[in-house]
Swiss-Prot record:
GO terms for molecular function: GTP binding; GTPase activity; metal ion binding; structural constituent of cytoskeleton. Mg(2+) binds at residue 69. GTP binds at residues 11, 69, 138, 142-144, 204, 226. GO terms for cellular component: cytoplasm; microtubule. Belongs to the tubulin family. Tubulin is the major constituent of microtubules, a cylinder consisting of laterally associated linear protofilaments composed of alpha- and beta-tubulin heterodimers. Microtubules grow by the addition of GTP-tubulin dimers to the microtubule end, where a stabilizing cap forms. Below the cap, tubulin dimers are in GDP-bound state, owing to GTPase activity of alpha-tubulin. This is Tubulin beta chain. InterPro entries: Beta-tubulin_BS, Beta_tubulin, Tub_FtsZ_C, Tubulin, Tubulin/FtsZ-like_C, Tubulin/FtsZ_2-layer-sand-dom, Tubulin/FtsZ_GTPase_sf, Tubulin_C. It comes from Euplotoides octocarinatus (Freshwater ciliate). Dimer of alpha and beta chains. A typical microtubule is a hollow water-filled tube with an outer diameter of 25 nm and an inner diameter of 15 nM. Alpha-beta heterodimers associate head-to-tail to form protofilaments running lengthwise along the microtubule wall with the beta-tubulin subunit facing the microtubule plus end conferring a structural polarity. Microtubules usually have 13 protofilaments but different protofilament numbers can be found in some organisms and specialized cells. It is found in: Cytoplasm, Cytoskeleton. Its cofactor is Mg(2+).
């Protein structure tokens, strides 16, 4: 029941995805060969959320891997869990998108998309009751952003009533891999606003900061960053996979977190984040988890929640704990920091509790927040976009693939609209809301 089909696209998406499957397989006791060697029936009870049981008791991930060049996929296949995946589920081209959104969305990607959709369809048909899709990709490159958003819109057409959740790595303010990131990201956001249900915003710089500051890693690798992300992905779906006292699923998350359909870009956080060696010496309490989870330093996107207000938030706890304590802490957070929550949505934190903690921890919590501060992120990308677009820099790479300048202008204004929508609700107060309704009534 409640299966999730996982799609990973592009280099970044495949690397995050590969790490994620290591984490999930560890939680469910699945060996790299696909055999089950766990120690508890609970690991098997709902293992079919992410795995198909194949002949001979092997567990095969419901994962689709796509890329426009074979490189990253080869390294996934050669990685520790490479033999876990179904060989037919690797779909790749040979040319690469060359960091060009237009190649991923219109030319190279469009040629490959049908074979990806075939695999997605096959996975979806193997499900009892499909909950939705989760996609890991980055918005700065060509494949993850261009082809990723193309796939999202195609899946949207075919499965309009299923939840579409993406884990999207946004370009970082200080760390840039490619010059044309602002173009690719803006064009992608334009698509994600329309076609995704929930977008978890991740940012390499914020992840680096967590590794440096909190985890005390002097030279964090992408592996370390991806490990943080996969802890979050695992936390978001823990309630689907293990029994809990208060369940949540992707749809409940969407209903509780999205007050207005376009505002579905979330910050995520995870607690406890302790450096690898020192973990086992501390017992964590629910108040400590709560405090750490709402801390700005724990956010995996480089926007500071203290610069905006939370429209809604969701806290998912894992481990043995009293639900009463969880509820008290959630109320406590809202009362103490009431200025950081909009007052026209009372009780705007959803909490859920899952009994089984992740490997190596007694308790953990995952935070998903819909904060107006996320606009900082879009503003930053929009400024960089405008700076280049004013001079039409690098545009020929996109127009050469058949794109029109109009599309850039549209994407830019859509992004600016998004920013002003967030700003509008950040400034709104409970009193104004009533007045606004009256005015609208008068206008009619």
């Amino acid at each position: 029941m409640r299966e999730i089909v996982h799609v990973q696209g592009g280099q970044c998406g495949n690397q995050i995805g590969a790490k994620f499957w290591e984490v999930i397989s560890d939680e469910h006791g699945v060996e790299p060969t696909g055999a089950y060697h766990g120690d508890s029936d609970l690991q098997l009870e709902r293992i079919n959320v992410y795995y198909n049981e194949a002949t001979g008791g092997r567990y095969v991930p419901r994962a689709v891997l796509m890329d426009l060049e074979p490189g990253t996929m080869d390294s996934v296949r050669a990685g520790p869990f490479g033999q876990l995946f179904r060989p037919d589920n690797f779909v790749f081209g040979q040319t690469g998108a060359g960091n060009n959104w237009a190649k991923g969305h219109y030319t190279e990607g469009a040629e490959l998309i049908d074979s990806v959709l075939d695999v997605v369809r096959k996975e979806a048909e193997g499900c009892d009751c499909l909950q939705g899709f989760q996609i890991t990709h980055s918005l700065g490159g060509g494949t993850g952003s261009g082809m990723g958003t193309l796939l999202i819109s195609k899946i949207r057409e075919e499965y309009p009533d299923r939840i579409m959740e993406t884990f999207s790595v946004f370009p970082s303010p200080k760390v840039s891999d490619t010059v044309v990131e602002p173009y690719n990201a803006t064009l992608s956001v334009h698509q994600l606003v329309e076609n995704a249900d929930e977008v978890m915003v991740i940012d390499n710089e914020a992840l680096y900061d967590i590794c440096f500051r909190t985890l005390k890693l002097t030279t964090p690798t992408y592996g370390d960053l991806n490990h943080l992300v996969s802890a979050c992905i695992s936390g978001v779906t823990a309630c689907l996979r293990f029994p809990g006292q208060l369940n949540s699923d992707l749809r409940k998350l969407a209903v509780n977190l999205i007050p207005f359909p376009r505002l579905h870009f979330f910050m995520i956080g995870f607690a406890p984040l302790t450096s690898r060696g020192s973990q086992q010496y501390r017992a964590l309490t629910v108040p400590e988890l709560t405090q750490q989870m709402f801390d700005a330093k724990n956010m995996m996107s480089a926007s500071d929640p203290r610069h905006g207000r939370y429209l809604t938030a969701s806290a998912m706890f894992r481990g043995r704990m009293s639900t009463k304590e969880v509820d008290e802490q959630m109320l406590n957070v809202q009362n103490k920091n009431s200025s950081y929550f909009v007052e026209w949505i009372p009780n705007n934190i959803k909490s859920s509790v899952c009994d089984i903690p992740p490997k190596g921890l007694k308790m953990s919590s995952t935070f998903v927040g819909n904060s107006t501060a996320i606009q900082e992120m879009f503003k930053r990308v929009a400024e960089q976009f405008t700076a280049m677009f004013r001079r039409k820099a690098f545009l020929h790479w996109y127009t050469g693939e058949g794109m029109d300048e109009m599309e850039f202008t549209e994407a830019e204004s859509n992004m600016n609209d998004l920013v002003s929508e967030y700003q509008q609700y950040q400034d709104a107060t409970a009193e104004e809301e009533g007045e606004m309704d009256e005015e609208e009534g008068a206008m009619e």
